[in-house]
């Protein structure tokens, strides 16, 4: 057993990154890693239960983004809103969603705009129903309130800005 009190134990995936100052960031990063993987698994299982088992997490997120506010979106809009640098992955996902008839596209001048098809809208609604049944109904307000969830979302968005700036700095090295 260890002599370190439970409150002082470092829960990290890379001990070499958790030594010295800033070790708490390594603990947060480990939480992000397992959270990202759990979220990816969740969205694919939720979408499968909604009736579409063949979509990747990115394709699911893009479908929901295009469906958001019933507004046509361009490739650049989707990439920007989801903070995806590699637009080729977004373009590939859009083609797959078009082939599955979950999206429709319309060329306007040099730009292509995407919107959710009636089948895509129905799938997003089925996903929402599964999400409500399996995820929301299992989340107790005692575990995390709506205000706490909003604050966590705000902190994650702020942290993403910090990581974006750090990635730009690293690219200059």
Q: Which stretches of residues belong to each language-model region?
A:
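Basic amphipathic alpha-helical segments that dock to polyanions
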Residues: 63, 78, 93-100
